[in-house]
A protein has these predicted regions:
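Exported/periplasmic ABC-transporter solute-binding proteins
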Residues: 1-143
């Protein structure tokens, strides 16, 4: 994981520096404030993402996004999800916590909210039907 931080911090600029081909690394980022960019910023911690070289457009790209974009929406066979520390981001590895980078989503409500539909919605989300729809949307089921 530190190697990914190093790439985005600009410490590695060629794939040959990390065991790959002699090609410029093109670290792709997302729009500031987007959900996936916010997760990447948190992953980077105190380290800043380096400015791109003008030559990076000709290089081999590395990027990040939520798994549901890759698994459920994009469907581009040329784009590959990579294992981190030998652990592939499968639904099972995300669900059991062995994949090192995850972002959780929450359904929350105020304790003083008396709307009678809230427990019904929560029960449905946790039901087999709700979990199946979550999975079909590219997310990982809770249970």
């Amino acid at each position: 994981m530190e190697q990914i931080r190093d790439i985005y911090a600009g410490e590695y600029t060629n794939w040959s520096e990390v065991g790959g081909a002699n090609r410029v690394i093109n670290p792709v980022t997302r729009l500031s404030g987007s959900g996936s960019q916010s997760v990447m910023d948190a992953f980077m911690g105190e380290r800043s993402i380096a400015r791109k070289s003008p030559f990076s457009i000709a290089g081999g790209a590395i990027g990040f996004s939520f798994r549901y974009y890759m698994d459920g929406i994009v469907g581009n066979q040329a784009v590959k999800m990579l294992a981190l520390n030998g652990i592939y981001p499968s639904a099972e590895n995300i669900q059991n916590g062995s994949y090192p980078i995850i972002s959780e989503f929450y359904a929350i409500y105020r304790a003083d909210n008396t709307n009678e539909n809230i427990p019904v919605l929560i029960d449905w989300i946790l039901s087999e039907e709700g979990q199946t729809i979550i999975e079909q949307s590219g997310y990982v089921r809770i249970q």
